[in-house]
């Protein structure tokens, strides 16, 4: 056995020279690109500023962290959570019928193509653009963030739903066709019972994404904790930045733990 391995290894083409040449070329390109790096207008007290930032972040403002008013971290985190949660739910509800009319194994291909083009168009536009558009329509606030999260969720959730539907065993659908079942009956009695776990897992995953996106959308005034975060950074109140970041970390860890528990239960059936 060892002789066969050695013989096969000896007969293998020697590519080390090409690999060495490729590594040399990449190293030369990196060195050449490094010559273009310029530090423009460095501040004389840059290290002191960096120290103040780190010190403020690691010494968060207890007043902001534990205040229960509308300016406190708990309220802002709750608002961010609600924007992400409701946006995910609304997006999933809209995605469900949209995915059914876009699955080529359920509807005629021209109809499925129209649905896929619509989903692709929704997914093309970034969340920031949607946020700015809805802020112009509804004004700054959580409702603009909710609409943005809902629309952004439709693109991804619909795509994942369609993939799950089209991965179904074709023999099951063919047997239902032979039995004279309508499309609605296929969805009601076969697709939904089989794919509930997959759909739920997709919704949970999208909620995790929306929770982070809702924070970023706050930077453009679409509600949530993002706006106070950018205001504190602009005013150099680093202890408030630390309090907000600490609250976000705790919220994300809690959501991750709950999501993991739900996924385990779904996997076990």
Give residue spans per PLM region.
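C-terminal transmembrane helix and the adjacent membrane-cytosol boundary/short C-terminal tail
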Residues: 201, 242-269
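Hydrophobic positions within alpha-helical transmembrane segments of bacterial inner-membrane proteins
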Residues: 84, 88-96, 100, 104, ...
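Glycine-rich helix-loop "coupling/hinge" segments at transmembrane-helix boundaries
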Residues: 136, 212-248, 267-269
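Generic hydrophobic transmembrane alpha-helix motif, especially the helices
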Residues: 119-153
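Cytoplasmic-entry segments and transmembrane alpha-helices of multi-pass inner-membrane transporters
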Residues: 98-131, 160
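Alpha-helical membrane-interface segments at transmembrane helix boundaries
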Residues: 74-82, 115-122, 204, 208, ...
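N-terminal, non-cleaved signal-anchor transmembrane helix
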Residues: 1-89, 101
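Membrane-cytosol interface at the C-terminal ends of specific transmembrane alpha-helices
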Residues: 140-191, 197-206, 257
């Amino acid at each position: 056995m060892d002789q066969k391995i050695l013989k096969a290894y000896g007969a293998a083409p020697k590519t080390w020279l090409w690999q060495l040449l490729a590594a040399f070329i990449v190293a030369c390109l990196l060195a050449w690109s490094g010559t273009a790096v310029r530090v423009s207008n460095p501040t004389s007290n840059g290290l002191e500023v960096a120290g103040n930032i780190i010190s403020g972040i690691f010494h968060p403002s207890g007043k902001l962290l534990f205040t229960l008013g509308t300016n406190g971290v708990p309220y802002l985190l709750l608002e961010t959570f609600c924007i992400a949660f409701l946006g995910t739910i609304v997006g999933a509800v809209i995605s469900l019928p949209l995915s059914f009319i876009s699955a080529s194994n359920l509807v005629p291909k021209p109809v499925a193509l129209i649905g896929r083009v619509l989903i692709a168009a929704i997914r093309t536009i970034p969340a920031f653009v949607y946020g700015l558009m809805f802020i112009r329509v509804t004004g700054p606030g959580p409702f603009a963030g909710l609409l943005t999260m809902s629309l952004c969720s439709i693109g991804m959730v619909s795509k994942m739903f369609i993939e799950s539907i089209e991965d179904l065993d074709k023999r099951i659908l063919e047997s239902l066709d032979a039995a004279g079942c309508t499309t609605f009956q296929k969805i009601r009695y076969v697709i939904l019972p089989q794919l509930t776990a997959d759909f739920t897992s997709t919704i949970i995953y999208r909620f995790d994404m929306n929770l982070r996106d809702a924070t970023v959308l706050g930077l453009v005034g679409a509600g949530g904790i993002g706006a106070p975060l950018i205001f504190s950074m602009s005013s150099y109140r680093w202890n408030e930045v630390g309090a907000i970041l600490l609250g976000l970390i705790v919220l994300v860890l809690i959501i991750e733990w709950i999501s993991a528990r739900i996924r385990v239960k779904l996997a076990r059936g």
